[in-house]
């Protein structure tokens, strides 16, 4: 099986840049784990409606979509905003 290719949108990077540094570090660590083992239980990587969701710390999530064999990361932020996005 080929490894999943990951891309992030400008909107994702803008949101990432607004996160506290400690959350950015956790997100970076979790991204490395995601590339090595996408279904590691600590990541909670799963399909949620039209999105794929992954943990970026206890109170933060990232959302992406699968497109042509790649994962396109669209957003990262607090769980409270995540709940609103996935319910749309």
What feature does the model see in each segment?
Residues 1-7, 18, 25, 56-88:
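Enriched for short, Lys/Arg-rich terminal
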Residues 8-12:
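Basic, amphipathic "hinge/linker" alpha-helix immediately C-terminal to the N-terminal HTH DNA-binding motif
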Residues 14, 33, 81:
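Active-site micro-motifs of SAM-dependent methyltransferase domains
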Residues 18-21, 36:
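Secondary-structure boundary motif
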Residues 23, 34, 49, 69-71:
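Hydrophobic alpha-helical segments
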